[in-house]
Amino acid sequence: MAIHLYKTSTPSTRNGAVDSQVKSNPRNHLIYGQHRCGKGRNARGIITAGHRGGGHKRLYRKIDFRRNEKNIYGRIVTIEYDPNRNAYICLIHYGDGEKKYILHPRGAIIGDTIVSGTEVPIKMGNALPLTDMPLGTAIHNIEITLGKGGQLARAAGAVAKLIAKEGKSATLKLPSGEVRLISKNCSATVGQVGNVGVNQKNLGRAGSKCWLGKRPVVRGVVMNPVDHPHGGGEGRAPIGRKKPATPWGFPALGRRSRKRKKYSDNLILRRRTK
């Protein structure tokens, strides 16, 4: 991804750093309307995820995370922008006439061929079971449950590493630093997700942030006591507590939020790094 800087003519262009224009011309049979209800609210209308709301209307692209076109070669026809994720997507034309979207692997260009199945070449964009991959392979779009489709390492620039195979399980190091076990029969895609430089973008202005459905973030210390535990006081005052808290009074900054006694606790060999 190429980062473009504009000539300074307004405060927006002075601070902005955007990626190169990747156009989107989605196929009608691969999109559907998505009713984005809630905007961070639960069924009772109470805010459970803050700083969300507004945003431009979106059409959802149907992404093939299963890669179940076995041993049928496909060709990359387009590389497109997807408003629902920070990774790009590419349209694949398969030999049997099927047309599907997949996540764009880093380095893939229009005209490249891909295939999924067992005993296929270890090549960027190919999907195959973990049992057929050599140790040290960089992978993304990894299944957790066999046949359910890829669920891990799908964000822009995400990549995991196959570090061991023993018995019925394979050991993976995930982008978060977590090391966990997954069935060797689960599938994954070779390579890294594209659009690696997405974290170098600078939107440059608040309006661009609003288009993405992200609202302003207000510090609790400048609120009233009725709105936040940190609020209140005369002028610029400290939070008045030994430790910071969430708007609902629970401990913040460091408290573990993972549920106890989860089924996958035995599969995690090392917790993610902060």
Swiss-Prot record:
Alphabetically, which GO biological process terms does the record hold? mitochondrial translation
Q: Does the keyword Secreted apply?
A: no
Organism of origin? Glycine max (Soybean)
Q: How does it assemble?
A: Part of the 50S ribosomal subunit.
| Example of a GO cellular component annotation carried by this entry | mitochondrial large ribosomal subunit
Alphabetically ordered keywords of this record: Chloroplast, Plastid, Ribonucleoprotein, Ribosomal protein
One example of the protein's molecular function in GO is: transferase activity
Family the UniProt entry places it in? Belongs to the universal ribosomal protein uL2 family.
Task: Output the superkingdom of the source species.
Answer: Eukaryota
Residues making up the signal peptide according to the UniProt record = none
| Family annotation (Pfam families) | Ribosomal_L2, Ribosomal_L2_C
Show the Gene3D superfamilies listed in the entry: 2.30.30.30, Nucleic acid-binding proteins, Ribosomal protein L2, domain 3
Tagged with keyword Secreted:
no
State the protein's name.
Answer: Large ribosomal subunit protein uL2cz
Provide the residue span(s) of the region labelled Disordered. Answer: 1-22, 224-274
Q: Which PANTHER family match?
A: LARGE RIBOSOMAL SUBUNIT PROTEIN UL2M, RIBOSOMAL PROTEIN L2
Q: State the compartments where it is located.
A: Plastid, Chloroplast
The main location is: plastid
Q: Which SUPFAM superfamilies match?
A: Nucleic acid-binding proteins (SSF50249), Translation proteins SH3-like domain (SSF50104)
